[in-house]
């Protein structure tokens, strides 16, 4: 866990609760003064539910169809009525030069929602996040979330 201040803790007892929170967050993001413009990081071990939460959030924001995990591509872009969204998965990110070569600096400088899994692998390159989710597994279905 990083040194950010925890302002809220949540318990997602099942995937339905995860989806419900994603819908609440989506509504809040769309209605903020700056529009759909934020950097959200998601920390947690493998299988903690980061991608599942992002899928629910993307669907709540209007993405239709299948939401792919960007583990191998590193980033998947989406366009919704509210604006641009980029879903990053830095799990396999090892080469800082890739940051420049792939145009990530330009993406993070542009307006839109950036959702970043495994931010620890891009430390020093990512901007300070607007929201950080620390997701941990309590049991098979239940997740403990600190923001």
Q: Which residues does each PLM region occupy?
A:
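Short hydrophobic/aromatic beta-strand immediately N-terminal to the Walker A/P-loop
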Residues: 39-41
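Conserved lysine of the Walker
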Residues: 50
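N-terminal pre-Walker A segment at the start of P-loop NTPase domains
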Residues: 2-27
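Phosphate-binding P-loop
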Residues: 28-37
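Short beta-strand-centered segment that lines the nucleotide-binding/catalytic pocket of NTP-utilizing
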Residues: 63-78
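P-loop (Walker A) phosphate-binding loop of NTP-binding proteins
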Residues: 43-45
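Short phosphate-coordinating micro-motif centered on Lys-Gly-acidic
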Residues: 1-8, 59, 94-147
